[in-house]
Amino acid sequence: VVASVAMLITCLDMPFIASIPVFGIGMIGIAFQVSFFQAVILAKVRKPGASIISSLVLGLFHVVFAPQMILFAFIGGLVGEVLGLLIFRSYKSYLSIGFTSCFLVPVITLCFVALYFMLMSPAKAMDHLQLTNAGWIIPTCVTLGVVALSIAGATCGTLLMRTLYKKGVLHESL
C-alpha cells in the first residue's frame, strides 16, 4: 500500500513533463521512481507474479495520462518477470530482484510506445519520435537516460531493502 501511494505521489510531475513534445520524456520523469518501487515490492514479496501485479497497479495510475499505458505496463512487467525467472529461477537473490526491476520502464519506452505510434499513425509517429527534425540523437539520448535511471532506481531499491533486512527492521519472507 505504501509503495502504491508513493508511486502515485511521484507521478504528480507527469502533467508538466507530458507537455514537452519529446519522445520518452515522460518516462525519464518516472524511470527512477518506478524501478525503485518495483525493487522494493519484489524484495518484500519474492513470489512469481509480483512483478506483473505491481506493474498493473502502476498501469492503473498511468491510465489517466494515456489509456494504453495499462497494457504497456502489463507487457513490461511480463517481460521483466519472464526474463528474471528464466535467468535466475526465483527472487531469492538481490541480483535477480534488481535485474527484473530495471526492465519495466525501458521495455515500455523502447518498444511499445514507439510501436504504438507507428501502428496508429506512421506520419505522426515520425514527427513524434523526432526522426524528421533532429535525426536519431534525441530519441537515443532519451532512451539511454531512461535505461540509466531505471538501473539506478532498481539498484537503490535493492540496496535499501538489503540494508533494512540486515539491520533487522524488516524480516525476510522467503
Language-model region placement:
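Membrane-embedded alpha-helical hairpins and interfacial helices in multi-pass inner-membrane proteins
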Residues: 20, 70, 95-173
